């Protein structure tokens, strides 16, 4: 059962007469029964009730079960029965005079279901996502969209067969029939007969066992014992409801609100806000006993429809998730001063458990449930189906019919679509690609990769990686990189190492489809950018006093509630006059949900005071406080802003290359390393919210704090920590590193693979932070080209190697010979070879120069990481990072097979150029291992670790270059079969054991065709 906050409806008695019905617009009388649709507010990150008169409500919604209604058990018994009857029959109407009448089921049209002939071929079936052709019969389920309630009831169209297969899910009860569809009467006679057969009205209790309605099993006739049990439960629930309402009615007569508060205080119960809530708490205590505090957090339990929920907090970051139907209680005390009231004097409290109705399995009612799913349904990690979250389009004649293809796609976790710009992949034939029909042109324009039908067969049964299969079966020269939620596993299935550990053998896939970057033009003045939503970006600047900029971005994440909120606050000062404004904006991260407010203040003093008050109200802290303290349900300040140095970075990149003194290949390399768009693209792939976390303020301290949280959560998951602990750490992590999940609930960090994916994300963010810091740092030199300025910041001497030289021939042979057989999705072409010498690195390496067993080995990384690598060297993960994120512990990893390291360049067909390093590595005595081992300290006498692979370069072909071994032989079997690794890995734990020698620019030629 969904937690109450996730229920799509609410019922209560109107607290006042101020609310208006969203259907008829008339006011809802105080104390009358009202029902609400819970919809996403367009103004803030949360849901709001759209209240209706009881009679109006049924014209806008069709409820499948009363368990979908928050507040249902708190209604009077007769109103509970009235709602149940309306749900069962769908036939209760209320006339204007207030009288009620029953309408025959066959006579009454269902206002939220309709049938008609498609007016065009533009509509798409919500079931199969195929087009509904013009003139075809289509059936609509009308719904209020939770994110766009202002549009009212919207048609969601289905093919008749698709509607029938989802009958129960869409709330078309067995008691309903085709004749009740709006528009049924004007259909053709033969179509009416067909629909009647497909959607018959059937009683819920048939004479035959297992009776079915188009595949939907109707409830079997209940046994006598079941009926007696239900009757007994109903009787108990009725008596309980009447007891509670009897207490409430009497208390209203004899006690004031202050009296009720005193009763709660006397029984050590929290006093809630609102007269009705106070009355409910007192009535519950008098009926069942005073509630004892939550054992986990000492918070107050509160009744909410299906259980008692703790309202306390585990920590300042996380709400307590304890809930129970049998909370501990003590006797309810009536203080002496209240015994003068006859009713309270004679009242005797009997300590007992509250009775709850048996949980009913609910189906999705309309409107659809909120985007935030219950905690138990939260997607915490990538799914094990390879096509999860993908939409597949088919074009042309395939060997299997559309229904067979659809079944295979759905079995693999995907869905079908008919729209090119919604598709993740297109399945077609080489003939169709060559023919280039109008539909195929749409596919090309949408940059959707086309694969052959064999892809479906292989992705289901092959041991090859997903990206490898994509490249193998691709039949179009175009196509963006396809991101998958499926994680690759070792080919032989024996390796216990997750695919995304820092072992260069597998390509780690990011989660879900990439989100398009959100762009906002920022006007930077002085210390910070003025938020353009204020409308004052051209005439005002952010106020500054005592070196402190009066601008704050705050975050609040609550995974249980599905909250992912931001709050921005700025004090603005006019550029010319003595005028001041306080601007604030708020909403949900990564969506258009939210609003803002601009207030002009009478004076500077008033503006400052208002800013300080708002900051304290939202965070619980003083603006001038040096040590921030996080408080429950309060926002946390993020160490970011809009990026004060954006303009400086723009100047450095806009005219790059016009007067550079560097060789052209080196110029191109520097442009590639410092490409801001590539950095932004990488961040978007990581689901980072670029509006709240721009490149300019990825502070190292913030990233290190995030590492610490991942370390804690990894430990908690490994040790079987409590749900509350994992929730708390997840909330802290997503607050610190704002993520754009759209309307989805932030996923729990409850899976080791997902945690390790986030570790890798932070590894990359650290290097991006270094690159951007270099870009914006230092002084401008009008005589120097921006490329030359950036080159100098790397503090690395870079020379182009002549491709006909002996060293170039050896390196190219090394690339050619050590391309692993299983990495056959692409070929590698050497575009450029650069000899590199990092400032001070050879001096640091000197003590290891005499160590035996020095080899020239490969190390691959994203292009966005190379500014950090060249300026600071290859680094070991910080102490804060979890050790289990790396197969052999925290070290620097190398390979002797080029493609093993090349997989870490994260190239794609759309972006096929990558960078890879060759480093001289002092290995000395190697500690040889066959399986994962989280090394924190090497055994005595060992200088490095070698992860033994099944295939390695032929040792007889090893050559030397400047006295260093180059293992450039062709890959052959090592004869080691009981190992986790396909290929060798080399790890050193001291950065001084590495001396980087070469940097290669490689082109990844992806195999796009079988022919």
UniProtKB/Swiss-Prot annotation:
Binding-site residues for Zn(2+) 2, renumbered to this chain: 125, 128, 159, 162
Chain span(s) of sequence motif Nuclear localization signal: 207-209, 220-225
Keyword DNA repair found: yes
Residues involved in Zn(2+) 3 binding: 294, 297, 310, 320
GO biological process: one example: protein auto-ADP-ribosylation
All copies of domain BRCT, residue ranges: 382-473
Gene Ontology CC annotation, any one: nucleolus
Chain positions covered by the region annotation Automodification domain: 371-522
Binding-site residues, Zn(2+) 1: 21, 24, 53, 56
Active-site residues annotated for this sequence: 985
Maturation and modification: Poly-ADP-ribosylated on serine, glutamate and aspartate residues by autocatalysis. Auto-ADP-ribosylation on serine takes place following interaction with HPF1. Auto poly-ADP-ribosylation on serine residues promotes its dissociation from chromatin.
Domain of life: Eukaryota
Reaction equation(s) it catalyzes: NAD(+) + (ADP-D-ribosyl)n-acceptor = nicotinamide + (ADP-D-ribosyl)n+1-acceptor + H(+); L-seryl-[protein] + NAD(+) = O-(ADP-D-ribosyl)-L-seryl-[protein] + nicotinamide + H(+); L-aspartyl-[protein] + NAD(+) = 4-O-(ADP-D-ribosyl)-L-aspartyl-[protein] + nicotinamide; L-glutamyl-[protein] + NAD(+) = 5-O-(ADP-D-ribosyl)-L-glutamyl-[protein] + nicotinamide
Enzyme class, broadest EC rank: transferase
Record-annotated PARP alpha-helical domain positions: 659-776
Subcellular location as annotated: Chromosome; Nucleus; Nucleus, Nucleolus; Cytoplasm, Cytosol
EC number: 2.4.2.30, 2.4.2.-
ZnF start-end (PARP-type): 9-91, 113-203
Activity regulation field: ADP-ribosyltransferase activity is regulated via an allosteric activation mechanism. In absence of activation signal, parp1 is autoinhibited by the PARP alpha-helical domain (also named HD region), which prevents effective NAD(+)-binding. Activity is highly stimulated by signals, such as DNA strand breaks. Binding to damaged DNA unfolds the PARP alpha-helical domain, relieving autoinhibition.
Broad class of the protein's primary localization: nucleus
Recorded family membership: Belongs to the ARTD/PARP family.
Assembly, per entry: Homodimer; PARP-type zinc-fingers from separate parp1 molecules form a dimer module that specifically recognizes DNA strand breaks.
Function in brief: Poly-ADP-ribosyltransferase that mediates poly-ADP-ribosylation of proteins and plays a key role in DNA repair. Mediates glutamate, aspartate, serine, histidine or tyrosine ADP-ribosylation of proteins: the ADP-D-ribosyl group of NAD(+) is transferred to the acceptor carboxyl group of target residues and further ADP-ribosyl groups are transferred to the 2'-position of the terminal adenosine moiety, building up a polymer with an average chain length of 20-30 units. Serine ADP-ribosylation of proteins constitutes the primary form of ADP-ribosylation of proteins in response to DNA damage.
Protein's name in the database: Poly [ADP-ribose] polymerase 1
UniProt source species: Gallus gallus
Lineage: Eukaryota, Metazoa, Chordata, Craniata, Vertebrata
């Amino acid at each position: 059962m969904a937690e109450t906050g996730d229920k799509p409806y609410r019922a209560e008695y109107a607290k006042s007469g101020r609310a208006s019905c969203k259907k008829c617009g008339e006011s809802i009388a105080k104390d009358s029964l009202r029902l609400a649709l819970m919809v996403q507010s367009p103004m803030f990150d949360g849901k709001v009730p759209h209240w209706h008169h009881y009679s109006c409500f049924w014209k806008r919604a069709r409820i499948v079960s009363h368990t979908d209604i928050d507040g249902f058990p708190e209604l009077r018994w007769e109103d509970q029965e009235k709602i149940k009857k309306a749900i069962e029959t769908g036939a209760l109407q209320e006339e204007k005079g207030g009288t009620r009448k029953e309408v025959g089921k066959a006579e009454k049209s269902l206002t939220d279901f309709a049938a008609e002939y498609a007016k065009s071929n533009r509509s798409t079936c919500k079931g199969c996502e195929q087009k509904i052709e013009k003139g075809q019969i289509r059936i609509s389920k009308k719904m209020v969209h939770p994110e766009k309630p202002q549009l009212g009831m919207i048609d969601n169209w289905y093919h008749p067969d698709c509607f029938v297969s989802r009958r129960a899910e869409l709330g078309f009860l067995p008691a309903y029939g085709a004749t009740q569809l709006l528009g049924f009467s004007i259909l053709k006679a033969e179509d009416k007969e067909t629909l009647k057969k497909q959607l018959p009205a059937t009683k819920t209790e048939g004479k035959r066992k297992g009776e079915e309605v188009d595949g939907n099993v109707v409830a079997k006739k209940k046994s006598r014992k079941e009926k007696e049990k239900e009757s007994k439960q109903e009787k108990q629930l009725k008596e309980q409801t009447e007891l509670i309402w009897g207490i409430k009615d009497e208390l209203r007569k004899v006690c004031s609100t202050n009296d009720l508060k005193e009763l709660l205080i006397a029984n050590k119960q929290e006093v809630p806000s609102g007269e009705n809530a106070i009355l409910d708490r007192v009535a519950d205590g008098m009926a069942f006993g005073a509630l004892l505090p939550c054992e986990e957090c000492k918070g107050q339990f509160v009744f909410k429809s299906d259980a008692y929920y703790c309202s306390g907090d585990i920590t300042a970051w996380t709400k307590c998730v304890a809930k129970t139907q049998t909370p501990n209680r003590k006797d309810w005390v009536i203080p002496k001063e209240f015994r003068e009231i006859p009713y309270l004097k004679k009242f005797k409290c009997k300590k007992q458990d509250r009775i709850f109705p048996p949980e009913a399995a609910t189906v999705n009612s309309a409107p659809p449930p909120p985007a935030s799913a219950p905690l138990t349904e939260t997607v915490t990690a990538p799914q094990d189906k390879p096509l999860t979250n993908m939409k597949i389009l088919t074009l042309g004649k395939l060997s299997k019919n559309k229904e067979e293809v659809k079944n295979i796609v759905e079995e693999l976790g995907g869905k079908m679509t008919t729209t090119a710009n919604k598709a993740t992949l297109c399945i077609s034939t080489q003939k169709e690609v060559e023919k280039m029909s109008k539909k195929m042109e749409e596919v090309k324009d949408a940059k959707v990769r086309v694969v052959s039908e064999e892809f479906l067969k292989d992705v289901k049964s092959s041991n090859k990686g997903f990206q490898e299969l994509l490249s193998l079966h691709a039949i179009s020269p175009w196509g963006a990189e396809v991101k998958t939620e499926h994680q690759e596993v070792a080919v032989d299935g024996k390796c216990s190492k997750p695919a995304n550990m820092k072992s260069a053998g597998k390509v780690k896939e990011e989660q879900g489809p990439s989100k398009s970057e959100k762009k906002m033009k920022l006007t930077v003045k002085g210390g910070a950018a003025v938020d353009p939503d204020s409308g004052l970006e051209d005439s005002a600047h952010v106020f500054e006093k005592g070196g402190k900029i009066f601008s704050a971005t705050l975050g609040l994440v609550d995974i249980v509630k599905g909250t992912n909120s931001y709050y921005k606050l700025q004090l603005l000062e006019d550029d010319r006059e003595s005028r001041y404004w306080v601007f604030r904006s708020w909403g949900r991260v990564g969506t258009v949900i939210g609003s803002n407010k601009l207030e002009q203040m009478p004076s500077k003093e008033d503006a400052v005071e208002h800013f300080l008050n708002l900051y304290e109200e939202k965070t619980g802290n003083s603006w001038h406080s040096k040590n921030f303290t996080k408080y429950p349900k309060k926002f946390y300040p993020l160490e970011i802003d809009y990026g004060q140095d954006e303009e400086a970075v723009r100047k450095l990149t806009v005219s790059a290359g016009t007067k550079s003194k560097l060789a052209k290949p080196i110029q191109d390399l520097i442009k590639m390393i410092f490409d801001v768009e590539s950095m932004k693209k990488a961040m978007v792939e990581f689901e980072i919210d670029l509006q709240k976390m721009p490149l300019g303020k990825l502070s190292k301290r913030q990233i290190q704090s995030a590492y610490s949280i991942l370390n804690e959560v990894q430990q908690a998951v490994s040790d079987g920590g409590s749900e509350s602990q994992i929730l708390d750490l997840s909330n802290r992590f997503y607050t610190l590193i704002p993520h754009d999940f759209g309307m989805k609930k932030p996923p729990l960090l409850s899976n080791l693979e997902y945690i390790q994916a986030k570790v890798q994300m932070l590894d990359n963010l650290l290097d991006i932070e270094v690159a951007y810091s270099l870009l914006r740092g230092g002084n401008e030199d009008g005589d120097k080209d921006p490329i030359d300025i950036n080159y100098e910041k790397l503090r690395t001497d870079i020379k182009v190697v002549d491709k006909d030289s002996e060293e170039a021939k050896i390196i190219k042979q090394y690339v050619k010979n050590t391309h692993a057989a299983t990495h056959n999705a692409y070929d590698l072409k050497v575009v450029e070879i650069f000899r590199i010498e990092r400032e001070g690195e050879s001096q640091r390496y000197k003590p290891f120069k005499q160590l035996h067993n020095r080899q020239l080995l490969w190390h691959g990384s994203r292009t966005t990481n190379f500014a950090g690598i060249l300026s600071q060297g290859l680094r070991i993960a910080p102490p804060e990072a979890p050790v289990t994120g790396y197969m052999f512990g925290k070290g620097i990893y190398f390979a002797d097979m080029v493609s093993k390291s090349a997989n870490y360049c994260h190239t794609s067909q759309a972006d096929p150029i990558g960078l890879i390093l060759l480093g001289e590595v002092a290995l000395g005595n190697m500690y040889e291992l066959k399986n994962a081992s989280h090394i924190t300290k090497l055994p005595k006498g060992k200088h490095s670790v070698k992860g033994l692979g099944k295939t390695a370069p032929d040792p007889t072909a090893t050559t030397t270059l400047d006295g260093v071994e180059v293992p450039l032989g062709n890959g052959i079997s090592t004869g080691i079969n009981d190992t986790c690794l396909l290929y060798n890995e080399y790890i050193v734990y001291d950065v001084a054991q590495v001396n980087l020698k070469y940097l290669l620019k490689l082109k990844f030629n992806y195999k796009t065709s079988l022919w």
